[in-house]
């Protein structure tokens, strides 16, 4: 008799415990070890959303935003300046001392890669802008010319290259087939009106009709 009463009390306590758990939810019912009920368990707070710049994503094609070969400013390019020594001549007369000037040659490249920079590589693009090395500034120098036959020396003023620069050229500069080098192109035609050619109109119409 006492055993049956004890079993009834245990059943009532278990039933009351399940009622309390249903009222409070499954958040309070968890294992004391490491397990948490996945449906309504306690989850850690979500991490703050990272900025797009700090995430591991390829931007600008995997290159830094300011890539050397994508710049359009000619001041960021430089070219080699070769020193050239020569004598100034005027007929049979020649200068007593040679003069030194710069020869602008070579391909233009980023200033940070010239002349001896670490990390050289292919920085140009086939379809990119074309930069040419051209003279930038000139200087005037007076030289003394010595003539043979005991003639009196003469003085002459020459113009020498002082510095070079890179100039951006377009594709039109290299398309020589578009330029007319004939004698008619050298003479500007002023005061003349161009008249349409009447010859060959019938033949051209016949060719167009037979083309289809």
UniProtKB/Swiss-Prot annotation:
Residues 1-23 form the signal peptide. Disulfide bonds join 79-133, 93-147, 104-164, 108-166. Residues 179-212 are annotated as: Disordered. Gene3D superfamilies: Cystine-knot cytokines (2.10.90.10). Residues 81-171 form the CTCK domain. GO terms for biological process: negative regulation of BMP signaling pathway; negative regulation of Wnt signaling pathway; ossification; Wnt signaling pathway. It comes from the Eukaryota. GO terms for molecular function: BMP binding; heparin binding. Residues 190-202 have a biased composition (Basic residues). The keyword Secreted applies. Glycans are attached at residues 52, 174. Belongs to the sclerostin family. Negative regulator of bone growth that acts through inhibition of Wnt signaling and bone formation. This is Sclerostin. It comes from Bos taurus (Bovine). The lineage of its organism: Eukaryota, Metazoa, Chordata, Craniata, Vertebrata.
């Amino acid at each position: 008799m006492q055993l049956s009463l004890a079993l009834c009390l245990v059943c009532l306590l278990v039933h009351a415990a399940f009622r309390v758990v249903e009222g409070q939810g499954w958040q309070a019912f968890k294992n004391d070890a490491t397990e948490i009920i996945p449906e309504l368990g306690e989850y850690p707070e979500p991490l703050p959303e990272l900025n797009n710049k700090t995430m591991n994503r390829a931007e600008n094609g995997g290159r830094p935003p300011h890539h050397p070969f994508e710049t359009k400013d000619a001041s960021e390019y430089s070219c080699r300046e070769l020193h050239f020594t020569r004598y100034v001549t005027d007929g049979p007369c020649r200068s007593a001392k040679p003069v030194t000037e710069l020869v602008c040659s070579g391909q233009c490249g980023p200033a940070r890669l010239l002349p001896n920079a670490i990390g050289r590589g292919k920085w140009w693009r086939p379809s990119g802008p074309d930069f040419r090395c051209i003279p930038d500034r000139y200087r005037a120098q007076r030289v003394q010319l010595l003539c043979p036959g005991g003639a009196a020396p003469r003085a002459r003023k020459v113009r020498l290259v002082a510095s070079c620069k890179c100039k951006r050229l377009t594709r039109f500069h290299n398309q020589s087939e578009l330029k007319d080098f004939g004698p008619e192109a050298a003479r500007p035609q002023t005061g003349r009106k161009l008249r349409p050619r009447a010859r060959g109109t019938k033949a051209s119409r016949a060719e167009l009709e037979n083309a289809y």
